[in-house]
């Protein structure tokens, strides 16, 4: 639901013919960010839709709203009212790589935002795990000393709480993976990507995979 200022006319090219379909009244309402009132019209459009989504959402359900810096901070306030501040779960940062330019008055904008809310305290959620690339990566990030059993099997000592330490064998750690936090490093699609459909705010399969596995 981006405030994209986009032109939503549809162009269809047939052999020897090019057709252009202007948006209907319904489409203009659905994308009222193209109206003269700008952000105010956009918020007037999205607010009743968020209310409807909340009504349709199961008590165990979650909602992820994908936005960028244009209106994210405004929509967050709307979602706090619609879903309740207590049901806010995360502001997920979708960070993607790119060629950074040296700007005169700001840093390069290199992320989008996904606001995650639950419908209620009954919300279903499962942590998402990524595989470690190597044992070396694990040791470097965890800054843990490697120990060895008499048979050569390597392990680390992890904090188990109450001052106790437990053995964690590295082969098991590698299989388990690392739990993902609220900063997701996933590159955006370029036009040559196989999964690209040419839609400017298309989500990648990897991003959708995380959403589905965490909340379904």
PLM segments and residue spans:
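Core catalytic lobe of class I
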Residues: 1-216
């Amino acid at each position: 639901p981006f405030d994209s200022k986009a032109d939503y006319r549809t162009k269809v090219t047939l052999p020897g013919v090019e057709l252009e379909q202007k948006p209907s009244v319904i489409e203009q309402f659905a994308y009222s960010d193209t109206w003269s009132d700008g952000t105010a019209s956009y918020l007037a459009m999205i607010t009743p839709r968020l209310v409807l989504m909340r009504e349709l959402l199961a008590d165990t359900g979650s909602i992820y709203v994908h936005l960028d810096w244009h209106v994210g901070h405004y929509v967050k306030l709307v979602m706090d009212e619609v879903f309740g501040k207590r049901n806010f779960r995360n502001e997920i940062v979708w960070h993607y790589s790119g060629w950074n330019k040296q700007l005169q008055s700001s840093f390069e904008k290199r992320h989008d935002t996904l606001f995650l809310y639950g419908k209620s305290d009954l919300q279903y959620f499962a942590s998402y795990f990524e595989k470690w690339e190597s044992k070396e990566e694990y040791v470097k990030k965890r800054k843990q000393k490697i120990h060895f059993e008499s048979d050569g099997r390597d392990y680390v000592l992890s904090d188990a709480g109450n001052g106790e330490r437990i053995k964690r064998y590295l082969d098991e750690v590698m299989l388990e993976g690392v739990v993902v936090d609220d900063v997701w490093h996933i590159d955006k699609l370029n036009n040559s990507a196989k999964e690209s459909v040419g839609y400017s705010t298309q989500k990648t399969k990897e991003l959708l995979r995380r959403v589905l596995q965490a909340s379904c």
